[in-house]
Amino acid sequence: MKEDYKIKFIRGATTASGNSIEEIEDAVVELIDELISRNSLSKSNLLSITFTATKDLDACFPASIARKCHGLDLVAFLDCQQMYVPNDVDFCIRIMAQVLLPSNNSVKHPYLRGASKLRTDRC
């Protein structure tokens, strides 16, 4: 019997150590690695990923890093600036990924580094 699949959404976030290409790359690679490993994803499961970054991160586009470092050429990516809120987490990169998973699979949302305080229930 063929398994039913559904489109599911996975949220997550991390923080970069600073506003350099290398620091952003390090954070994005770790976040995508965790997204994939925690949810047992393959490239074919990933449909799209939207990145947001706080206004203090402008050295590069997180999506270009994810596309390059993970060979995700067929995934739709979008970068946006996160809405500014005073006292928000600095150097924060958030994601929302659309994935195709078996209906009965639950998702695991990776909240890493300084972003773990955003969702203590999911860390």
Locations of regions flagged by a protein language model:
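Terminal domain-initiation and capping elements
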Residues: 1-123
